[in-house]
Amino acid sequence: MGNTMLLTLLLVVVAAYGQTPPPPEGFRWVKNESFSDEFDGEVLDTTKWYARSPYWVNGRPPATFRAGSVSVKEGKLQIKNSVLDGDKKYNIAGGAVASVAKDALYGYYEARMKASSISMSSTFWMKNKPDTKECPFEVQELDIVEVVGQQKTGWDFRTNLKSNTHIFYTDCDGEKTVKSAGGTEAKIDPPADEAYHVYGCWWVDANTIKIYLDGEYQFTMNPSTHFRDTPFNKPMYMHMVTETYNWETPPTPEELADDTKNTTYYDWVRSYTLLPVDQ
């Protein structure tokens, strides 16, 4: 077998099965089952996932979230976007699958996903639910990947990997401030809606987040330290969501009715934490 063919096969295997980065010396990766699922059953595992996020209930108009958009079949978690009738504010049904567990913290998180081919997002991210009784309080969001399979604006979320960190800060007077920090972009090839890709994130510590694509390191994100020296240290929920953006033209009813374009597929999601090798 030629070297080129062998390398190609190796890349295919990595893309299909995922690959954790080498652990630090003296440590090993251990699977975190609370945030892992192969989606091999016939229904969503409700011990692990909500079919409609209780933390972000409605979504961003014109799309909202409906549990009926979510299914597990053919070995995939599927979120099928569709026309929603009878609602003046929302006319598109998307989906927001959220973890039951709320303690995702430092570790490695990855999902094998194929985006829809419409102008809605296909995403994999994490966020904490704030305690609004605190003063001040923060919401932290870790966007591992946000892609859009059909672009109608000039922004390329189809072939460029977009990852970000956001801190939503509310002071004791109710004044809100947002600080965001991302990384350099990386190419998604083939485009996000044409093939499955493994999107990974090593949340190293409160200041360091490394992004991976198909098992390869791409860039590092350093969350803003505007409010605290250790900004990203709060446990989070995991989300797999399809939504509309206020900067992107929504899909047409005809596009939403096309079953070859309207669905985002998650083959699996896997998560790992570090433990000493002697444990």
Swiss-Prot record:
<dbReference type="GO" id="GO:0005975">
    <property type="term" value="P:carbohydrate metabolic process"/>
</dbReference>
<keyword id="KW-0378">Hydrolase</keyword>
<feature type="binding site">
    <location>
        <position position="141"/>
    </location>
    <ligand>
        <name>substrate</name>
    </ligand>
</feature>
<feature type="active site" description="Nucleophile">
    <location>
        <position position="141"/>
    </location>
</feature>
<protein>
    <recommendedName>
        <fullName>Beta-porphyranase E</fullName>
        <ecNumber>3.2.1.178</ecNumber>
    </recommendedName>
</protein>
<feature type="active site" description="Proton donor">
    <location>
        <position position="146"/>
    </location>
</feature>
<feature type="signal peptide">
    <location>
        <begin position="1"/>
        <end position="18"/>
    </location>
</feature>
<feature type="binding site">
    <location>
        <position position="60"/>
    </location>
    <ligand>
        <name>substrate</name>
    </ligand>
</feature>
<comment type="similarity">
    <text>Belongs to the glycosyl hydrolase 16 family.</text>
</comment>
<feature type="binding site">
    <location>
        <position position="56"/>
    </location>
    <ligand>
        <name>substrate</name>
    </ligand>
</feature>
<dbReference type="GO" id="GO:0042597">
    <property type="term" value="C:periplasmic space"/>
</dbReference>
<comment type="function">
    <text>Cleaves the sulfated polysaccharide porphyran at the (1-&gt;4) linkages between beta-D-galactopyranose and alpha-L-galactopyranose-6-sulfate, forming mostly the disaccharide alpha-L-galactopyranose-6-sulfate-(1-&gt;3)-beta-D-galactose.</text>
</comment>
<keyword id="KW-0732">Signal</keyword>
<dbReference type="GO" id="GO:0033916">
    <property type="term" value="F:beta-agarase activity"/>
</dbReference>
<dbReference type="InterPro" id="IPR000757">
    <property type="entry name" value="GH16"/>
</dbReference>
<feature type="domain" description="GH16">
    <location>
        <begin position="19"/>
        <end position="277"/>
    </location>
</feature>
<dbReference type="InterPro" id="IPR013320">
    <property type="entry name" value="ConA-like_dom_sf"/>
</dbReference>
<dbReference type="Pfam" id="PF00722">
    <property type="entry name" value="Glyco_hydro_16"/>
</dbReference>
<dbReference type="InterPro" id="IPR050546">
    <property type="entry name" value="Glycosyl_Hydrlase_16"/>
</dbReference>
<keyword id="KW-0574">Periplasm</keyword>
<feature type="binding site">
    <location>
        <position position="146"/>
    </location>
    <ligand>
        <name>substrate</name>
    </ligand>
</feature>
<feature type="binding site">
    <location>
        <position position="243"/>
    </location>
    <ligand>
        <name>substrate</name>
    </ligand>
</feature>
<dbReference type="InterPro" id="IPR016287">
    <property type="entry name" value="Beta_agarase"/>
</dbReference>
<keyword id="KW-0326">Glycosidase</keyword>
